[in-house]
Amino acid sequence: MRTGSNFLESNLNALPGVTCHGEAFNPFFIGGEGKQELFGIELAGRNADPSGFLRAMRDQTDGLAGFRYFSDHDPRVFDLVMNDPACAKIILTRNQLESYISWKIAVESDQWWLANTKHLKTVRPTFDLPEFLQRIDDLTQFQAKLVKALQVTGQTAFTLDYDDVLDLGVLNGLAEFLGVPARLENLVFR
């Protein structure tokens, strides 16, 4: 597996009462690569009414419903979730050079999710300094916006670093933060 967010999602989904619906607001798909529909709503419907899509997600999910949100996803969703104190926030951070290299590998190999290393495509990514610096600037601005939104709404988030997702204790602390009684006995590697 290449990214911590995929690994985190797998482990959250292993907790009874928790369902992470992947990148539900990715501009190109719903939930996972190639998916164009979720909760009976197609991509165009989700894009036209993200609030309605969130309602459908809550209504059609047993237990806690969640999704992964990245800075390049639908910006309207940011305001919807940040203004909802009932929506728990989990912030996963990573060394930006490692993140950039992982992203470049995904782009250049067209492998965005890797559960089976037999299918691993080996590439040596091209490092583009202006592109890298722009990504850092964009992410810094997004993180500042995120922190400010938490501050002005009096909310807190569960923060973890990329390396923390390999710590069973930290993931069980996250379950506690979410108010879920279940705990992981082992990490899920799939």
Question: Where are the regions that the model predicts?
Answer:
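PAPS-dependent sulfotransferase catalytic core
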Residues: M1-Q60
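Short, conserved catalytic or adaptor-binding loops enriched in Gly and charged residues
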Residues: A56-D59, K148-T153
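Loop/turn-to-beta-strand initiation segments
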Residues: T61-A65, A88
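C-terminal accessory extensions appended to soluble enzyme cores
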Residues: R183-R190
